[in-house]
Amino acid sequence: MDLQITCTEIIKPSSPTPQHQSTYKLSIIDQLTPNVYFSIILLYSNAGESTAKTSDHLKKSLSNTLTHYYPLAGQLKYDQLIVDCNDQGVPFIEAHVANDMRQLLKIPNIDVLEQLLPFKPHEGFDSDRSNLTLQVNYFGCGGMAIGLCFRHKVIDATTAAFFVKNWGVIARGAGEIKDLIIDHASLFPARDLSCLAKSVDEEFLKPESETKRFVFDGPTIASFQETFTSFERRPTRFEVVSAVILGALITATRESDDESNVPERLDTIISVNLRQRMNPPFPEHCMGNIISGGLVYWPLEKKVDYGCLAKEIHESIKKVDDQFARKFYGDAEFLNLPRLAGAEDVKKREFWVTSWCKTPLYEADFGWGNPKWAGNSMRLNQITVFFDSSDGEGVEAWVGLPRKDMARFEKDSGILAYTSPNPSIF
């Protein structure tokens, strides 16, 4: 890629953060969230006006948006479990790309996509780094890519998706933004976690992994859903896609080259958005890590059955409600989890499933229309992240596994039958 950085500027909130809002407390959920960055990349076929006008438009609207999302413009002080909302601002990087966007990004390549970001997310653990950094890439053909890196300790994917949507709302002058900051740290206060046997960051820092994109199109998902005849209800898009992914992982794990080290069980942690599950519900767009996890245990000796997997996934998510969250986090029941306490007596493999589907990434309209494509370029390990396809019907599954496992995973009969490996986005 022929990319040249042309400008770097610090964008600060348009209005100073009031003194009574100068400290943003982290919650126990923030503490338990891995200290990593995650990325979002938004592609636009045509950014409309001249580069100079577009740049000025984005900077001014970003400054106004940060007034509402002021912790993103602050500094994380993890030893104090706070964000100092000091309005230090966020780096805004501009780059010119000589290549044609459609040709360069026709087939998403993680090495190419990474260059559209301000830094590689898996290398961005420096505590002095900003909570948000972004890079706006202008292509010679008139297209544009906005790459953003968010600190996960401070926000979750739902917050990030609403951030880019609301940035667009402000850029277009299309409405007001309110009720973003809630005091979830009072409900789920931070705690001393020195007793934990396992760092929450460990499993995300292993470099020997490979990330690939598998796309389930809408008609294939709909047809597959109809085969679940034993269900009392139609399984959701998330449930059937997750079942295929986990089924392939179970098979790949069984076929390990090291038979002496094959796990007895696959433990899957499914990320669940708590906002609408609380009583009373939190605003759907409120800021923070307001997530929990459902658990699915699957013995490796058990035959893969998509119907059973989908039911297990459904039941695990159903258990995550207001009462669960208040006990698990508010009463610190998470400390009893064997995986954190170091009391495991079962050889197991852990895998994470998280979905960004139904978040408003495709509503990030800055005045020149919705993005052509919304995705990421994260190098993942033992996790899959789901995104809506651009038509809103399909699912893009980005899967990160150790290389040997990926070679077996992508040859699984379910993956071959129901997905297209990394198809064109144009």
From Swiss-Prot:
Top-level taxon of origin: Eukaryota
InterPro entries, sorted: CAT-like_dom_sf
Keywords noted in UniProt: Acyltransferase, Transferase
Reactions catalysed, as given in the entry: isomeliandiol + acetyl-CoA = 21-O-acetyl-isomeliandiol + CoA
Catalytic-site annotation from UniProt: H152, D365
Pathway: Secondary metabolite biosynthesis; terpenoid biosynthesis
Subunit record text: Monomer.
Family recorded in the similarity comment: Belongs to the plant acyltransferase family.
The protein's role, per its UniProt record: Acetyltransferase involved in the biosynthesis of limonoids triterpene natural products such as limonin, a compound with insecticidal activity responsible for the bitter taste in citrus. Catalyzes the formation of 21-O-acetyl-isomeliandiol from isomeliandiol.
Protein name as it appears in the record: Limonoid 21-O-acetyltransferse
Species: Citrus sinensis (Sweet orange)
